[in-house]
């Protein structure tokens, strides 16, 4: 038991360190090759922050731990909005840009609804005799299609947008080429090995305590893979730049569904078992709550009181999951 917990923690460390080194090496190399900081931020850095969720969901799907794969994504999205959004707003009220309200938040809500529609064949398929909910390879390709549209749209908007004051314009670090390659290769190895340890130990811990893999995925695994987003958002709030937090949260949620579940289910279909329709509805309700606070009540500002409501919502959802054990 103690060994499983240590391996679980080691897996988290390897995943986060691997993502950091991979992002550092790849982004520095890309900037040396002439890519702008904005393009690097929209692609490599965004991928780096979503790498923990990607590797964990992918490894879970390959190993047959479908509930961890799906629970990780649904749980991460809920954690991002309620826990990270709530904590960040408590540190400093969050100002939301007009573009985020008009474009990114609606896209996030669309991704939630698309995933719910594709996942619940017994409700939406309309096929007699359908008794199992599966995110199939074809549906995975559909999610990847949405991701390509999202990426193309984002680049098109970015070209016409003014220069992002938060983009990384720091001087390119003078790392030797061999060290950059070591960062990239070492980061990938750490991600894969850490992901394997993380998933295997999480599954073992669930069996030891008699907990379902969906519970582990929705809670511990989701929180663990969301640590980069939590660190980034809280750090931004402490630096008096809390507006970065919502873009970080919303972008991560879109990546989680369109890219991560798209790749995972394309490689191996994911059966929807322990993750219930209620979990999907909590995710959708969280997104609607964020939108309501931003548009209807907050005049593009999520205040501390609203942050407290988000955080309490996460606590209530976690208590509900514990009561279902």
Positions of predicted regions on the chain:
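Hydrophobic alpha-helical segments, chiefly the membrane-spanning helices
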Residues: 1-325
